């Protein structure tokens, strides 16, 4: 298996730290808002990486954190006049709603920054004791020039970084590129006691401490988006390797951006679509299929037409699966097998090998999906030759085709499985949720029109009627939100 390692700037053979065991840390969201489609890409892709390792028989330790202490959370909480940790917990719960819809498996561990302050303080103390950190007025900074290899992940020198960075000049720092490990407490912000006074962690130290706790040093794969290469992952390497005198992570994987009109999708640019907005228009399986339809290191430009095309492509798989299930229900008789049965069995073996070859080449999901289409085509051809009955041998081959489709799906995670029958659910439950979302949004629009006309009785009647049906409306400064009661 070959993985493109950002650190080496090349594909390298994957050799796990521990035989038969893969350790992965993927940077999770800063929980101050619902996730957008750009956040969903690494979520779905690294879930697929994990699934493929499991398919190959590895034991996988998968850690994905939540940054629940951050400037963005504090600012958003101030706007909404609630406690920052309460706001963060709210959006952690909302994250799981979206992740579950996209059929993303829960990580083995989902650590939160607020629950790992002790580990963070311990790591900062080690850096201070070794001369890599210094204290100024209750703030603690990492001295980047104390780590000789700073810049090895991004491939840039400190001078180049400083010239191109938008760094606020702080005369208290020894170097403009030094970054905060600990921030002194400010009124209204979450804070914890520390050897340097009350305060809270900086962003970068959080992942270093949590990755070390759950995976140890020299773990296998650290993942995230391209935008995390610098400064976040560069700083993680500096902190962890300066403190431990050992490699931090061995393979660094970064996915490309989702773009709109060739511009990165991001909350800061305001050109983003929330996952739940997309799921109001398209079924979850189609959205996941779309996210895997392009190689993970390539940019993925967003528009509705691409999702429509993804839906049509996925329907080809579902059509083959429907036909296969019909054939598997045919009665069995004793007789001669249809011509070409042996060739079909060989074709199944070939397609499996091609699929694995694609995934072994830096997780090329786009190519792997093309072999899924080949499989659907071959299933259609074989099933089309069947009559009203099948032999035991033919039934065995149909079962092999079903197993192969399930194995491909086990890796790509597109369709959910009926635990009782073992069959894949061709129509996902999320399709009903999509209809519900659309209907509720339509009703909200009608209510808003009534409110704009000062027709308060109609607006109240709509709100009360929805509440009786288990749908609660919340009027917020950002607009009307709804949720299912209970």
From Swiss-Prot:
Renumbered ranges of motif 'HIGH' region: 29-39
Residue sites binding ATP per the record: 267
The keyword Electron transport appears for this protein: no
GO biological process terms held by the UniProt record: cysteinyl-tRNA aminoacylation
Transmembrane segments: none
Cofactors, names only: Zn(2+)
Motif ('KMSKS' region): 264-268
Record's catalysed reaction(s): tRNA(Cys) + L-cysteine + ATP = L-cysteinyl-tRNA(Cys) + AMP + diphosphate
Cellular component GO terms held in the UniProt record: cytosol
InterPro entries for this protein: Cys-tRNA-ligase, Cys-tRNA-synt_Ia_DALR, Cys-tRNA/MSH_ligase, CysS_C, Rossmann-like_a/b/a_fold, tRNA-synt_1_cat_dom, tRNAsynth_Ia_anticodon-bd
Name of the protein in its database record: Cysteine--tRNA ligase
Taxonomic source organism: Desulforamulus reducens (strain ATCC BAA-1160 / DSM 100696 / MI-1)
């Amino acid at each position: 298996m070959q993985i493109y390692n950002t650190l080496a700037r090349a594909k390298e053979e994957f050799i796990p730290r521990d035989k038969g065991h893969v350790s992965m840390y993927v940077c999770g969201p800063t929980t101050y808002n619902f996730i957008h489609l750009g956040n969903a890409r690494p979520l779905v892709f690294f879930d697929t990486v994990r699934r493929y390792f499991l398919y190959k028989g590895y034991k996988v330790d998968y850690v994905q954190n939540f940054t629940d202490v951050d400037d963005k959370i504090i600012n958003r909480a101030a706007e909404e006049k609630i406690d920052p940790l309460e706001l963060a917990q709210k959006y952690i719960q909302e994250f799981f709603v979206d992740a579950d819809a996209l059929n993303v498996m829960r990580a083995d561990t989902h650590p939160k920054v607020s629950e790992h302050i002790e580990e963070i303080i311990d790591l900062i103390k080690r850096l201070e004791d070794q001369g890599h950190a210094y204290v100024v007025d209750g703030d603690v900074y990492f001295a980047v020039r104390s780590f000789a290899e700073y810049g090895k992940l991004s491939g840039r020198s400190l001078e180049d970084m400083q010239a191109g960075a938008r760094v606020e000049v702080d005369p208290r720092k020894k170097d403009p590129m030094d970054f905060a490990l600990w921030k002194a407490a400010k009124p209204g912000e979450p804070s914890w006691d520390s050897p340097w006074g009350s305060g809270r962690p900086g962003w970068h130290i959080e992942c270093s401490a949590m990755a070390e706790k759950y995976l140890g040093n020299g773990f296998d794969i650290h993942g995230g988006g391209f935008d995390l290469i610098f400064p976040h992952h560069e700083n993680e390497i500096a902190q962890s390797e300066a403190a431990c005198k050992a490699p931090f992570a061995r393979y660094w994987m970064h996915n490309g951006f989702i773009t709109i009109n060739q511009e990165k999708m991001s909350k800061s640019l305001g050109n983003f679509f929330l996952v739940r907005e997309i799921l109001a228009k398209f079924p979850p399986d189609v959205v996941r299929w779309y996210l895997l339809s392009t190689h993970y290191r390539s940019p993925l430009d967003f528009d509705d037409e691409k999702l429509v095309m993804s839906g049509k492509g996925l329907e080809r798989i579902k059509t083959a699966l429907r036909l296969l299930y019909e054939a598997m229900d045919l009665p069995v008789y004793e007789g001669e097998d249809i011509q070409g049965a042996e060739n079909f069995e060989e074709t199944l073996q070939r397609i499996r090998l091609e699929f694995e070859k694609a995934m072994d080449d830096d997780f090329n999901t786009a190519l792997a999906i093309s072999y899924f289409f080949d499989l659907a085509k071959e299933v259609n051809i074989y099933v089309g030759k069947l009559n009203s009955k099948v032999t035991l041998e033919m039934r065995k081959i149909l079962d092999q085709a079903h197993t192969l489709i399930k194995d491909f799906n086990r890796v790509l995670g597109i369709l959910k499985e009926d635990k009782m029958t073992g069959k894949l659910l061709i129509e996902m439950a999320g399709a009903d949720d999509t209809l519900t979302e659309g209907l509720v949004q339509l009703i909200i629009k009608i209510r808003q029109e009534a409110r704009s006309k000062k027709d308060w009785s109609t607006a109240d009647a709509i709100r009360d009627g929805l509440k009786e049906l288990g749908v609660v409306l919340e009027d917020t400064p950002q607009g009307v939100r709804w949720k299912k009661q209970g």
